[in-house]
């Protein structure tokens, strides 16, 4: 950062916040938990890597084993719920990495699996739908939704599936592996690696999935990008906020945070141009010069041991039994196993502290449908985290409901002489209280500009027209109204006669 940059007050605040995160001891943030958290064993499994519960039954747990099994645990009884070992390749960091049960699982039996397959070496990433029948999930029910090539390396597969607060399926993919994103995938909007993806899997069967309204890059599942290996992410069951644990390379591990309802739509989290709060390398990586803007993490920490650090992102504790842990975000590190928590907020997290527990070889956290949290060790044990209030089960949190929104777009003329400007107006409805809200104009995946709504909730753009083009306008959610996208507006070149 230059001296002139630090002269700006906002840059000073930003620098101070980063310094507090980076040198937490000096800022008094590294504290100890005031109330005891304990581990209660659920049992030992074969290479467990994830745990979740049925949406309507928090005592019906599903433990995911990396080699390809899903084991159901209910009232102390174990059954093999699904067995994908014949199609799962667990070389390197691959395997069956997580599952997500559909919100209507009780009636539909649908669940979604994230795994690396045996068809190719290195393995491709698959996201597939399966259906339970008679208390088990037959392999024959598998329906592939998404295949992502991963041709160079057997690491950085990502692996998280999670339904968001609006009912769409979010998917976390790594950058393709190797060091320093050699293939430049994370910054490439043509690649689905190094991304958070967002799809709607609830289709009529004619198409395998659809792109939900509001995805920022046209007909693409990409929601946000610039991630190295977002192995674990989660949504706050009370507020809907998205928290991502992105595994760093040699220097920093980071937590990225995006409040509901925006959830980081279109965000570029910076990799491989940035690592944590650290700025671009000099000289910049290919494709990074003049890039950005980047969305900084709310927290990062240095690799404690060279070559050994991997953040394990967790959940915001929302069960009342957790005492003063309530509202704090849990995370750990695969190398240290120490369970820690922080207070998630923008622009910087606060109050990072140890919870006084270690889980050797921790690979994941989990959450059941009443907000109780779990820790999973790849060595075999799965634990429930028990707070001072015991094992009480809180009711399902209600997600905030937003009002519907409409964006219109029109042009003074649909035909314009080449290299002349078009006069385009975009407007939103309802208008109440939305003055000053930003509206963006897009040509395909390229944002032409952003303007703020006037008192009658309209904005005007004057793009220069060089060829036939289609525009669309978008408005993000403001916490009251949902995000919305206009129809496409076609502008043609006026031919001389």
Locate predicted features.
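Surface-exposed loop and turn segments in beta-propeller and other repeat-based domains
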Residues: 79-92, 141-157, 203-223, 269-306
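Short strand-edge motifs at loop-to-beta-strand transitions and within beta-strands
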Residues: 457-461
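Acidic, Gly/Ser/Thr-rich repeat motifs that build Ca2+-stabilized beta-propeller blades
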Residues: 34-180, 232-235, 240-252, 307-341, ...
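Short loop/turn segments immediately following beta-strands, especially the blade-tip
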Residues: 128-137, 197-208, 258-265, 342-348, ...
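Bacterial N-terminal signal peptides
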Residues: 16-31
